[in-house]
Amino acid sequence: MNDNPVRNFAINFGPQHPAAHGVLRLVLELDGEVVERVDPHIGLLHRGTEKLMEARTYLQNVPYFDRLDYVAPMNQEHAFCLAIEKLLGIEVPRRGQLLRVLWCEIGRILSHLLNVTTQAMDVGALTPPLWGFEEREKLMVFYERASGARMHANYFRPGGVHIDCPQQLIDDIGAWCDPFLKVCDDLNDLFIENRIFKQRNVDIGVISLEDCWRWGFSGVMVRGSGAAWDLRKAQPYECYEEMDFDIPVGRHGDNYDRQVIRMEEMRQSTKIMKQCVEKLSQASGKGPVATPQHKVVPPSRAEMKRSMEALIHHFKLYTEGFHVPAGEVYCGVEAPKGEFGVYLVSDGTDKPYRCKIRAPGFAHLSAMDFLCRKSMLADVSAILGSLDIVFGEVDR
């Protein structure tokens, strides 16, 4: 009889694995098929965003935020613009606020659609992503009509948004909403109620609410464990106070609850979008989309060609940029992945002294070992999918 002790063996999951959600490398220590330890290796997409921002003006820094969570770009721009506006002490006009909320909810649907359908693909269902991508395509066309770009929109500006949306675009977004709710019902029937999907996700990746707070979780992760915590309700920003929507909350804190919550959040986002479309179409929703302060927001092209002062403002704004009063501020928004925060320190110049980005996915990924321990190897990709991680924001 062989007396050699049985030892654990280590395998690499990624960094080019199709279920790794980007450039993630996990070193898994296995005892047979049971996971004993998970060691996430990050940094393969590190671009030094926070340091690069210190050498550029505030306006030049906005596009960097599109490249963090590149699945829902405008939500990140929102946090950065809110932080700058807080330091400058300026208020965004009502129409600008409504447009921001509208595009942030479109970003939420873009993110959740990708996540829930690819989660189904990770556990073996190949049809949902095809249905989901069809709807995402329509939303990306809206992005393109508003900003000229399908993904890296660069649409939000300190003080408002870059340009107004034509009424036809607002109407088309409104017309998209109701048919999409039918697609949500179809997706629900297709895989949320599917018994194989349930077997692969129910009671997998369970985490208690207490542990959620300890690990610094936010967003869907804490709502899946039973906390009705949503920054849009808890600390309302822009015009979210006017919006009527519910916060879906789970009970068990497992993969399945998190996916059901994302499905319901898409319905709630559609509800908010319909309210925004209605308000934007009313007389009270008309008006400027950015603050009239030309030290921060450029004058219109027509004005610039007639007025010398407007030309000077434009020239100064795009050569030197605007100066932000010295101080420090933290602004968090309810991004699709969780609380996306920007801690901005200004030294009174035209460039940020320091900009610390709080990426929600970073805290979620750090708990991979805690969530996967004693799970089966096949459950690792299901747990990873339920965390909804994008490496643009984790590695920055």
From Swiss-Prot:
It is a peripheral membrane protein. PANTHER family: NADH DEHYDROGENASE [UBIQUINONE] IRON-SULFUR PROTEIN 2, MITOCHONDRIAL, NADH-UBIQUINONE OXIDOREDUCTASE 49 KDA SUBUNIT. It catalyses: a quinone + NADH + 5 H(+)(in) = a quinol + NAD(+) + 4 H(+)(out). Transmembrane segments: none annotated. It comes from the Bacteria. NDH-1 is composed of 14 different subunits. Subunits NuoB, C, D, E, F, and G constitute the peripheral sector of the complex. Belongs to the complex I 49 kDa subunit family. It is found in: Cell inner membrane. The keyword Hydrolase does not apply. Its EC number is 7.1.1.-. Its main location: membrane. This is NADH-quinone oxidoreductase subunit D 1. PROSITE patterns: COMPLEX1_49K. NDH-1 shuttles electrons from NADH, via FMN and iron-sulfur (Fe-S) centers, to quinones in the respiratory chain. The immediate electron acceptor for the enzyme in this species is believed to be ubiquinone. Couples the redox reaction to proton translocation (for every two electrons transferred, four hydrogen ions are translocated across the cytoplasmic membrane), and thus conserves the redox energy in a proton gradient. One of its GO terms (molecular function) is NADH:ubiquinone reductase (non-electrogenic) activity. Keywords: Cell inner membrane, Cell membrane, Membrane, NAD, Quinone, Translocase, Transport, Ubiquinone. InterPro entries: NADH_Q_OxRdtase_suD (IPR001135), NADH_UbQ_OxRdtase_49kDa_CS (IPR014029), NDH1_su_D/H (IPR022885), NiFe-Hase_large (IPR029014). One of its GO terms (cellular component) is plasma membrane.
